[in-house]
Amino acid sequence: MSHRAFWFAARLTAVVAVVFLPTPSSGQTPVPAGAIAAPTEDDILRFKMPTVTVTAQKEPEDRQKVPVSVTAVTRETIDAAGIRLVSEAAILSPNTIFTESTARKLSSARVRGIGSSPNNPAVTTYLDGVPQLNANSSSVELLDVDRIEFVRGPQSALFGRNALGGLINVVSSRPSMAGWTGSLALPFANYGAWTVRGGVSGPVLKDRLAIGFSAAQVSRDGFTINDVTGHDLDSRSAFSVKGQALWVPAANWEARVIVTGEHARDGDYGLHDVAALRANPFHAARDFEGSTDRGIVGTTIQVRRSGGPLVFSSTTGIVKWTTRDRTDLDYTLQPLLQRDNAEEDLQFTQELRVASAEQAPIALSDSAHLRWQAGVFLFSQGYQQDAVNSFSPFVVAPFPVSQHSPRSALDDDGVGLFGQATVTLATRFDVSAGARFDHESKDATLETFYEPQIAPPSRVDAEKGFSSVSPQVSAAWRVGSAHTLYGTVGRGFKAGGFNAASPAGREAYDEEQTWNIEGGVKTEWAGGRVTANAAVFHIDWDDLQLNVPDPAVPAQFFIANVGGATSNGVELEIAARAAPGLDLFTAIGYTKARFGAGSVSGPIGIEGNLVPFTPDYTVSVGAQYSRLVGTATVHGRVDVARSGAFQYDEANSLGQDAYTLVHLRGGYTARRWLAEVFVRNAFDTAYIPFALPYPNLAPSGFLGEMGAPRTFGASVGVRF
């Protein structure tokens, strides 16, 4: 069977399974994630805001009680807003943005100004407890997701490496033990967009074994037109799948296996000169039209034993991804330079953890109790890249020349030991202290050479180790049952490493460290109908790692330590159940992040400059309304997101002005059937959220991609 025939058969099998798999009924059963459940009259008339449980500190806790800034996007919000990617949910979290292009592999989260290279993220995405050590595998289609947690501020004391800016925790819905359920949805939109999404879930052995399966095929035409050929450049097409099994072999024991996969075959990057894009949006001109492909397979195994005074848990993760992108590297009409870049990565992670049970804290006295957790984390990662730059005749020689820049192999192994203890005094005052020790060993083989050999090849073999201790202390005071005041001080850590490609002598970079001071308040008002949370923070960076361009090689970037920086800001989140069926919400963030004294990037002094891709403010406001009409439900939602101005590079030579996006969605649900209409970027705002320095070849000095234009469509679906 050919490669293409295999994937066609896989897609057909997935859709047939979703539609025709037997689904025996067992009374009233929950609707699986991905379907929009018709709310009952009790749901709509309920005034109190729901309690949301998060695992921002590994153990389940009420979002309003945990002394951490966290925004939880629940399954209900994911469905109501039509969220299909983590980056789409980020507008609901203050001071959180994604630096990403339409290519799936380029997507990096930034929180409070902290963010860096996809190869060494400062804000790590956890998919069902498994950290994505390279951001390449983190931007995936959301299937059967129960919630997304945006945790802001350093979490290194518990999560270790690459969490000094925060973390994003994506949690899948559990397979249903109660009865079989399923859903199928068919959205379609302009730009030739169409999607088939579906899922089933239910028990195989009563109270012992349940399974779940979901899949999606998502495709659209490109937004950007190549004026040379008239073709659209940046088309997208991907098939995603998730399978789960939940096994309860005995009381207090459970095991869960989650397998995910993605097969993406996309068009080219929509990159073009920024000045030209602003004059003529969604148009480019190049002689070669390329492609960007990605494949991901991930397996997660979770085992948990509860009951008694201790809780034991194990999370094992294996993630394998490959990418290949072919593009016109000069991004001009001239046949000068093309790039064929292949990357692959295999990671293994294992965490073992023990914690005191919530119902069995250790009594220190009549008014003092202790809760604790401790664990060990192991990982191994192997990354390989072979990027071939093909020069046309008379560019570097009178004949065609290929340059492998780089051909590299990076291996990384590490261990982390962590613990946290929380003492509760008189049921109202918590004092917590935690710390984590991390050690990593890194090896690199870095090669650059030409075919034919017009210059001597270079090869670097290097190894280096990094160790760090990351402490954190916090205090929380519960004022009555509805309000919590808290303060935290913590250190963040991101290991150093090796660049797959860089100028000679810049192959290695050092670790980055931060100290974070934060104070906040979490409150409930009007009998639980209103929640209002606020935080202020101050961050000090040392040896900040920044992704900077290689002046000698187009589109090649490397990580460099550029000096220090500070970030100061405030955040406010308010949600209110204003009337039966009516929810109002807002999230506001302000950040001032600047480079410190003595900071330099190459030959350029950047002291006092703004940290790139850090808007000075983010604002999100919205409303959601549901109403019963007979036995059916009508619903509508509006989201308005505004981003402040930000810079594209550390030299602050070009940036994006403030812009506003408006998203609308509404629908009608009757018994098993659902119909919706939607508009994203309703006012067709033109903006360039992603741009990179490109001296010599781009007239403005920058290549950029337009943000998505106005898209609109409809969706029909069925639940069974």
Q: Which residues are covered by each model-predicted region?
A:
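N-terminal Sec signal peptide and the immediately downstream disordered periplasmic leader
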Residues: 1-83, 87-95, 251-252, 299, ...
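N-terminal periplasmic accessory domains that precede
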Residues: 86-89, 108-113, 126, 150, ...
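Short acidic/polar hinge/loop motifs at secondary-structure boundaries
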Residues: 128-154, 171
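Membrane-embedded beta-barrel scaffold of Gram-negative outer-membrane proteins
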Residues: 302-329, 478, 484-490, 510-570, ...
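Gram-negative outer-membrane beta-barrel transporters
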Residues: 355, 359-364, 375, 427, ...
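C-terminal beta-signal and adjacent terminal beta-strands/loops
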Residues: 540, 641-649, 668-720
